[in-house]
Swiss-Prot record:
Stretch forming the signal peptide: 1-27
Record-annotated disulphide pairs: C35-C71, C39-C59, C45-C69, C49-C70
Protein family: Belongs to the DEFL family.
Protein name, as recorded: Putative defensin-like protein 86
Recorded superkingdom: Eukaryota
Cell compartment(s), UniProt: Secreted
Primary localisation category: secreted
Keywords annotated in UniProt: Antimicrobial, Disulfide bond, Fungicide, Plant defense, Secreted, Signal
Organism whose genome encodes this protein: Arabidopsis thaliana (Mouse-ear cress)
Membrane-spanning intervals of the chain: none
Matching SUPFAM superfamilies: Scorpion toxin-like (SSF57095)
Length: 101
């Protein structure tokens, strides 16, 4: 009985890791490249980010409860200057920008 519970836990863990790591390995996940400006409106944020060369801009909650304009871009392995491993980026968890890795 304990072996069955343990093996189902291992299978579930492996499935979750697969859903997390496969997009990271392939380099096809969207990351936040810049998240430092105060956000007044999403259309204004989007226009600013598009002007700076990012794909999109959104107002997101920051860890301290404020709202920041975050510029989103596609972190692709084809970009020579911004690989997912070497460039700093943020992780969004439930719409909150929480981690700079």
């Amino acid at each position: 009985m304990a072996i069955t519970k343990m093996s189902s836990l291992i299978i579930l863990s492996l499935m979750m890791l697969t859903f997390i790591y496969i997009p990271m390995i392939s380099g096809q996940f969207r990351g936040i490249k810049q998240c430092e400006m105060k956000c007044y409106s999403t259309p204004e944020c989007n226009a600013t980010c598009l002007h700076e060369g990012y794909e999109e801009g959104k107002c997101l909650k920051s860890w301290d409860g404020g709202v920041e304009c975050c510029c989103l871009g596609l972190l692709a392995s084809s970009h020579q200057d911004s690989s997912p491993i070497s460039s700093p980026h943020y992780i969004i968890f439930h719409g909150i920008c929480i981690l700079n890795i």
